[in-house]
Amino acid sequence: MASVAELKEKHAAATASVNSLRERLRQRRQMLLDTDVERYSRTQGRTPVSFNPTDLVCCRTLQGHSGKVYSLDWTPEKNWIVSASQDGRLIVWNALTSQKTHAIKLHCPWVMTCAFAPNGQSVACGGLDSACSIFNLNSQADRDGNIPVSRILTGHKGYVSSCQYVPDQETRLITSSGDQTCVLWDVTTGQRISIFGGEFPSGHTADVLSLSINSSISNMFVSGSCDATVRLWDIRIASRAVRTYHGHEGDINSVKFFPDGQRFGTGSDDGTCRLFDVRTGHQLQVYSREPDRNDNELPTVTSIAFSISGRLLFAGYSNGDCYVWDTLLAEVVLNLGNLQNSHEGRISCLGLSSDGSALCTGSWDKNLKIWAFSGHRKIV
């Protein structure tokens, strides 16, 4: 029987072999991919998106949380935002008036994620309690203004890092977790429909931090993980991942489908955002900033979102910056962190309204901010 030392040696050798093969595969793919988005766009005479510092302004600051803001989501149809904070509350905001319509005290204060149902009548949240709680906003509130939990989805063996409703389906929700899995739930019954990963060899090998459902093909979703990979899943086939995407060198904190559903973007601890082709698996572009003057390490990318056309990529960073990238030319056209009334802490979350008229950012400074183009122009 092999000793522990021998097993460790074999494991180290196998790991080195896998890493070597992965690097050879990356180099081979790079040889076959004769260009990237940025170089091709320049050959076609594309010019950068033009921005002035006064074009995008902070028109609202939403104050009400007493702890770090961790997550936010826009309702699909109306001008409402839900936010989750370290203070153990969910707050539902009217984005037009800055008024709070609900301030829900959670039974577990360690919340990490929140999401609106497609009809805007319910919100979901999850965190370190390993559960996903559903609240019906039409429920009768108690004397303190709190509303009861309508459903608790239990089954994960680790923290719930992200949740998202399947588009146009109020009864279907997908969660990602520190137990290395994603789960499709029936919200009505509270039952798990499918588990993605776990004992299956094609699943993630570390905590799953983020997910994004394809709005064009709602059967498909991607998940980003601490194993530095993204996996594509088909909710009809839970037994295996459709494809695995490599390229990052750190935890993947955020994934988001491109508006056309044919590509997706990522944001990582390695300080870069990347754009991948869903079908081919090719990495199309890397969006990387220069290191800070006093620090050789790049700030972490915490959250990303695309404009409705896909021409702009919004990326929040751990140092409080929020870059607006031109996705075609891989250039930063604006940094919201340099504008008046910007955040004073880490950007933890961000999201674009469904009509593309406004961007909302959340921060560890306890505030949310709504950004819009001056002159009421939509974000391109």
Curated annotation (Swiss-Prot):
Coiled-coil annotated spans: none
Entry superkingdom: Eukaryota
WD repeats: 64-103, 106-145, 155-195, 203-243, 247-286, 296-335, 342-380
Keywords carried by this UniProt record: Cell membrane, Membrane, Repeat, Transducer, WD repeat
InterPro entries in the cross-refs: G-protein_beta_WD-40_rep, Gprotein_B, Guanine_nucleotide-bd_bsu, WD40/YVTN_repeat-like_dom_sf, WD40_repeat_CS, WD40_repeat_dom_sf, WD40_rpt
GO cellular component, one term: endoplasmic reticulum
Keyword NAD: no
One GO process term, biological-process aspect: regulation of root development
Subcellular location field: Cell membrane
Role played: Guanine nucleotide-binding proteins (G proteins) are involved as modulators or transducers in various transmembrane signaling systems. The beta and gamma chains are required for the GTPase activity, for replacement of GDP by GTP, and for G protein-effector interaction.
Family, similarity comment: Belongs to the WD repeat G protein beta family.
Subunit structure: G proteins are composed of 3 units, alpha, beta and gamma. Interacts with the gamma subunits RGG1 and RGG2.
Name recorded for this polypeptide: Guanine nucleotide-binding protein subunit beta
Organism: Oryza sativa subsp. indica (Rice)
